[in-house]
Swiss-Prot record:
InterPro entries: Ribosome_maturation_RimP, RimP_C, RimP_C_sf, RimP_N, RimP_N_sf. One of its GO terms (cellular component) is cytosol. One of its GO terms (biological process) is ribosomal small subunit assembly. HAMAP family: RimP. Belongs to the RimP family. This is Ribosome maturation factor RimP. It comes from Paramagnetospirillum magneticum (strain ATCC 700264 / AMB-1). It is found in: Cytoplasm.
């Protein structure tokens, strides 16, 4: 198991017990490492600074005990934000209908980067469906998605604000 997978396996249960969901873990940098943890509240309420501080204290204590990273690092905790990364299969379903940018590991019709309206997953849950203006609908195998994130649009902002009012 690689370090990122080990970190996810270590951190996710702790966040779950606190009422949060792990969105992404990234360890970046060469000489100065930064461990970035992105989390969301399970109850759907927008993350606040206090939520990030609670997660930081809990994860910091956990990592001090388990010590999975041998070098010095900086811990950063954040919410996904409005133009959030799409990292889990359920993200592609939950955010269907909104504009997204995606990058695939393998070229599809000679391209690796795409931008279009997210349609969600196919019935088998294997392919991410996206409508590109010039090319029509395409399907990218979920396993081949290198990166994906929502595009900040007026529609996305309005939907996010509406969700917070409810």
């Amino acid at each position: 198991m690689d370090l990122q997978s080990r970190l996810e396996a270590l951190i996710a249960p702790s966040l779950d017990a606190m009422g949060y969901e792990l969105v992404r873990v990234q360890l970046q940098g060469k000489q100065r490492l930064t461990l970035q943890i992105m989390a969301d509240r399970k109850d759907g309420v927008m993350m606040a600074v206090d939520d990030c501080a609670d997660i930081s204290r809990s994860v910091s204590a956990l990592l001090d005990v388990e010590d999975p990273i041998s070098a010095a690092y900086t811990l950063e905790v954040s919410s996904p934000g409005i133009d959030r990364p799409l990292t889990r299969a359920k993200d592609f379903v939950a955010w269907a209908g909104f504009e997204a940018k995606m990058e695939s590991c393998q070229p599809i019709d000679g391209r690796k980067r795409f931008r279009g309206k997210l349609l969600g997953l196919d019935e088998a849950g294997v392919n991410v469906r996206l409508v590109i203006e010039a090319a029509g609908e395409i399907a990218i195998p979920l396993a081949d998605v290198r990166g994906a994130k929502l595009v900040l649009t007026d529609e996305l902002i309005a939907a996010t604000l509406k969700d917070q009012e409810e």
